């Protein structure tokens, strides 16, 4: 998609509460991740809610534009980059939504895609619980990115990937 098609994103700007960017600098900044690849997107969207994400998907479907979810952009497989719409969850959708302790060594949590692994580590500090996937990008890896790529780390051989 070229710069001449930027005006189609005006329609999307009227449907989402989050931020939408088509400028060259921001597109360049989102053209790479932790891999060796560089692919410049047509648009970057920072959604503020799941309703925003629904509208982005509807828009992308209507115009047959690919979507690429992005967390911290620390992955090594190129999953966070692409020529279509990059949906960056780190700016607004980055909260823990709930936590339930099951026992001293078990619990569950619900979070938005931009919630960082390091924030969960800090939350669990002092307890006997931990999240064993332990990606190499450590504290700034996001759960959306980790789940989207089935990330793993040093403990994955014993406990499995995300």
State the predicted function of each range.
Residues 1-34, 40, 59-67:
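N-terminal accessory segments
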Residues 12, 35-67, 85, 89-135, ...:
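N-terminal glycine-rich flavin-associated loop
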Residues 70:
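Conserved PLP cofactor-binding pocket of PLP-dependent enzymes
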Residues 137-139:
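Internal maturation/activation junctions in enzymes
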Residues 145:
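Beta-strand-loop-alpha "switch" segments that mediate conformational coupling across diverse proteins
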């Amino acid at each position: 998609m070229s710069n001449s098609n930027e005006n189609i994103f005006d329609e999307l700007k009227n449907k989402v509460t989050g931020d939408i960017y088509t400028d060259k600098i921001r597109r360049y900044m989102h053209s790479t991740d932790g891999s060796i690849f560089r692919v410049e997107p047509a648009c970057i969207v920072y959604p503020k809610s799941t309703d925003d994400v629904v509208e982005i998907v509807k828009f992308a479907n209507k115009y047959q534009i690919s979507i690429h979810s992005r967390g911290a952009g620390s992955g090594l497989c190129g999953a966070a980059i692409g020529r279509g719409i990059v949906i960056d969850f780190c700016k607004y959708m980055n909260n823990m939504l709930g936590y339930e302790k099951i026992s001293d060594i078990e619990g569950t949590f619900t979070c938005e895609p931009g919630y960082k692994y390091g924030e969960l580590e800090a939350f669990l500090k002092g307890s006997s619980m931990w999240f064993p996937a332990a990606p190499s990008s450590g504290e700034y890896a996001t759960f959306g990115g980790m789940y989207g790529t089935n990330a793993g780390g040093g403990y994955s051989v014993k406990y499995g990937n995300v």
